[in-house]
Amino acid sequence: MLTSGNILLAGSLLSPEPGLIFWTTITFVLVLIILKKIAWGPIISALEEREKGIQSSIDRAHGAKEESEAILRQNRELLAKADAEADRVIREGREYAEKIRAEITEKAHQESQKMISAAKEEIEQEKRRALAELRNEVADLAVRGAEKIIRGVLDADVQKKVVDSMIQDLSTNRN
């Protein structure tokens, strides 16, 4: 009988009875109304909040991406400017070094020309002084020779002695 009771009970659930359908519908509608009043609002607002939070996160992510791209562009521009500035500084340094080298070379050339000119002038003065001294000595020797000739006899032996004497005088005066 127990078996037949289960079948009977199962049969009553499967067979549509108007009272059961009515009360099931009423219960379903009441549950929907209660859920709409109590749970539907908070669920929808939670979903909307969640959607707003996700949208806000997406917007912030887009903003951060754009900002990072802008910073990256700015960094690249700054790097390019720094490279250009470094190239300019190096170029100016090289130009300045070349200018200084040229100035130093020119100054050294001028100094060497001055030194050469001064040395030539000094050599020329020494040469003139030596020639003047030599002329004076030759004149002195000539005067002494003439004096000796006038005092002595003019034969060949005397002349030879006078010349030898003048040569010796010249040698001793130079030393």
UniProtKB/Swiss-Prot annotation:
It is found in: Cell inner membrane. CDD domains: ATP-synt_Fo_b. GO terms for molecular function: proton-transporting ATP synthase activity, rotational mechanism; proton-transporting ATPase activity, rotational mechanism. It comes from the Bacteria. Pfam families: ATP-synt_B. It is a single-pass membrane protein. One of its GO terms (cellular component) is plasma membrane. The chain crosses the membrane at residues 20-40. Its main location: membrane. Keywords: ATP synthesis, Cell inner membrane, Cell membrane, CF(0), Hydrogen ion transport, Ion transport, Membrane, Transmembrane, Transmembrane helix, Transport. Belongs to the ATPase B chain family. F(1)F(0) ATP synthase produces ATP from ADP in the presence of a proton or sodium gradient. F-type ATPases consist of two structural domains, F(1) containing the extramembraneous catalytic core and F(0) containing the membrane proton channel, linked together by a central stalk and a peripheral stalk. During catalysis, ATP synthesis in the catalytic domain of F(1) is coupled via a rotary mechanism of the central stalk subunits to proton translocation. Component of the F(0) channel, it forms part of the peripheral stalk, linking F(1) to F(0). HAMAP family: ATP_synth_b_bprime (MF_01398). F-type ATPases have 2 components, F(1) - the catalytic core - and F(0) - the membrane proton channel. F(1) has five subunits: alpha(3), beta(3), gamma(1), delta(1), epsilon(1). F(0) has four main subunits: a(1), b(2) and c(10-14). The alpha and beta chains form an alternating ring which encloses part of the gamma chain. F(1) is attached to F(0) by a central stalk formed by the gamma and epsilon chains, while a peripheral stalk is formed by the delta and b chains. This is ATP synthase subunit b 2. It comes from Chlorobium luteolum (strain DSM 273 / BCRC 81028 / 2530). The gene is atpF2.
